[in-house]
C-alpha cells in the first residue's frame, strides 16, 4: 500500500503549476482540509491563488507553503518527464518534489492524522498557501499577511515548509533569514567622442573610486545568529556598443543581504553618504525585498528541535543562511517563524528529487510539532 504522503505528493507534482499558476494544486489541498473540518477562505489577488484555512480557536500554529514551481529547463535533460512523478531507488522525481510539493503533502497528511488523534485540540491549526513565491512574490503571502493584519488575525507560530535540510531531513532548521535590498544606481555624465574627452564627462571613470569603496566597505560584523552583511554588484551597463563613444550614463545594480545589525534606512544613508563624498551626479532607487527576521528561541524552536530529535536522533543546526523566503512577510505578524523541510540538493535543478522516506519522516515531524503546541 502506497504511503499517503507520497500519493498526495505525486498528485501535486502532476499539476504543472509554473509560477504564478496553481494548476489545481490548491483545490486538491482544500478538499482534503475541508473534509476534516477546516474553514477555507480563498484570498486571491490578481493572477495569484491563495488560501487561508483554519480549524479550532485560540493559540494559532500555521503551516505555510507555495504550490508554484520554477520552470523545468530543457526537458530532454530529465530522466523522466518533470510533471510525471516517478520513484526510482527510493527517490521521488519531479518538478516541485523538494520545493515544495513534498512538504505540502507532508503537512496535509500530518494535519489529517493530528485531527484524527485530537479532534478537540485546544489551539487553532491553520494553513497559509500561495501560488506566487517563486516568481514576483507580489500577490501571494505578502498580500495575505496584509489582509490578516488589517483584521488583527492572531498568529503565534508559523512553520514554513521550505527545503531547509542539507544532507538528511532535519539537519538544518532555518530560524531566521537575512534582509534583502537592491539599489538601482544611475550615474550621469556627458556623452561624447572618445577622441575629445575634454568635451565629455565619462560616468564610468567617475564612478570607479566610489564603487571600489563600496566593495571594500565592511558593513557590519554580523552577530551570533547572522553572518556579516554582504554587498554584491549584480549588473553593470554603459555605452552605446560603439568603441568611439564615451557613455553618457552608467547603470549599476547592487544587492545587500543584511543582518539584524543593520536596517534598510541605515544602508540607504551610508550609501548616499559614500556617493556624495565622491561628488557624483546620480539618481538612486531602492527596492526592499524583505526585512531580516529571527526566531531566536521559544516554544516553536523547541517543538521543532524536539520533533527532529524524536525521529532522527540528531540535533538540528539553527541557521539563517540562504536566500529570502515568505517567512519574511509572515514574521511581520509578530509570529515565531521557523523553516523545516526536505533536503535542498536538487531544488530548481534538472531531475529534482526527494527521498520518499524523508517525506514520510517529515510528515511525522510536522504532526509532532502540532501535538506539542496545540493538542
From Swiss-Prot:
Its EC number is 3.5.1.18. It catalyses: N-succinyl-(2S,6S)-2,6-diaminopimelate + H2O = (2S,6S)-2,6-diaminopimelate + succinate. It is an enzyme of class 3 (hydrolase). The active site is at 68, 133 (proton acceptor). Zn(2+) 2 binds at residues 99, 134, 348. Zn(2+) 1 binds at residues 66, 99, 162. One of its GO terms (molecular function) is succinyl-diaminopimelate desuccinylase activity. PROSITE patterns: ARGE_DAPE_CPG2_1. Binds 2 Zn(2+) or Co(2+) ions per subunit. Keywords: Amino-acid biosynthesis, Cobalt, Diaminopimelate biosynthesis, Hydrolase, Lysine biosynthesis, Metal-binding, Zinc. GO terms for biological process: diaminopimelate biosynthetic process; L-arginine biosynthetic process; lysine biosynthetic process via diaminopimelate. HAMAP family: DapE. Catalyzes the hydrolysis of N-succinyl-L,L-diaminopimelic acid (SDAP), forming succinate and LL-2,6-diaminopimelate (DAP), an intermediate involved in the bacterial biosynthesis of lysine and meso-diaminopimelic acid, an essential component of bacterial cell walls. This is Succinyl-diaminopimelate desuccinylase.
Amino acid at each position: 500500500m502506497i504511503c499517503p504522503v507520497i500519493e498526495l505528493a505525486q498528485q501535486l507534482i502532476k499539476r504543472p503549476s509554473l509560477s504564478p499558476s496553481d494548476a489545481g494544486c490548491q483545490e486538491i489541498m482544500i478538499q482534503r482540509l475541508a473534509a476534516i473540518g477546516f474553514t477555507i477562505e480563498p484570498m486571491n489577488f490578481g493572477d495569484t491563488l491563495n488560501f487561508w484555512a483554519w480549524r479550532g480557536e485560540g493559540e494559532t500554529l500555521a503551516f505555510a507553503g507555495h504550490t508554484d514551481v520554477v520552470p523545468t529547463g530543457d526537458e530532454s535533460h530529465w530522466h523522466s518527464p518533470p510533471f510525471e512523478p516517478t520513484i526510482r531507488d527510493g527517490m521521488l522525481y519531479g518538478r516541485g518534489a523538494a520545493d515544495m510539493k513534498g512538504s505540502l503533502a507532508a503537512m496535509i497528511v500530518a494535519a489529517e492524522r493530528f485531527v484524527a488523534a485530537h479532534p478537540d485540540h485546544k489551539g487553532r491549526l491553520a494553513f497559509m498557501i500561495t501560488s506566487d513565491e517563486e516568481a514576483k512574490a507580489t500577490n501571494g503571502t505578502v498580500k495575505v499577511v496584509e489582509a490578516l493584519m488589517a483584521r488583527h488575525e492572531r498568529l503565534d507560530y508559523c512553520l514554513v515548509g521550505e527545503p531547509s535540510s542539507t544532507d538528511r531531513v532535519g539537519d538544518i532548521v532555518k530560524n531566521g533569514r537575512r534582509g534583502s535590498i537592491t539599489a538601482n544606481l544611475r550615474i550621469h555624465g556627458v556623452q561624447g567622442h572618445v577622441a575629445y574627452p575634454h568635451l565629455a564627462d565619462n560616468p564610468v571613470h567617475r564612478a570607479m573610486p566610489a564603487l571600489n569603496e563600496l566593495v571594500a566597505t565592511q558593513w557590519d560584523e554580523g552577530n551570533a545568529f547572522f553572518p556579516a552583511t554582504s554587498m554584491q554588484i549584480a549588473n553593470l551597463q554603459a555605452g552605446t556598443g560603439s568603441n568611439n563613444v564615451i557613455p553618457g550614463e552608467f547603470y549599476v545594480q547592487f544587492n545587500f543581504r543584511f543582518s539584524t545589525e543593520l536596517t534598510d534606512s541605515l544602508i540607504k544613508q551610508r550609501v548616499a553618504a559614500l556617493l556624495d563624498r565622491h561628488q557624483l551626479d546620480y539618481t538612486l532607487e531602492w527596492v526592499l525585498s524583505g526585512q531580516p527576521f529571527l526566531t531566536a528561541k521559544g516554544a516553536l524552536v523547541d517543538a521543532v528541535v524536539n520533533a527532529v530529535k524524536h525521529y532522527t536522533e540528531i540535533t538540528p543546526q539553527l541557521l539563517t543562511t540562504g536566500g529570502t523566503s515568505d517567512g519574511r512577510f509572515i514574521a511581520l505578524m509578530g509570529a515565531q517563524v521557523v523553516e523545516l523541510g526536505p533536503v535542498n540538493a536538487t531544488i530548481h535543478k534538472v531531475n529534482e528529487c526527494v527521498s520518499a522516506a524523508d517525506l514520510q519522516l517529515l510528515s511525522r515531524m510536522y504532526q509532532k510539532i502540532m501535538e506539542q503546541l496545540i493538542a
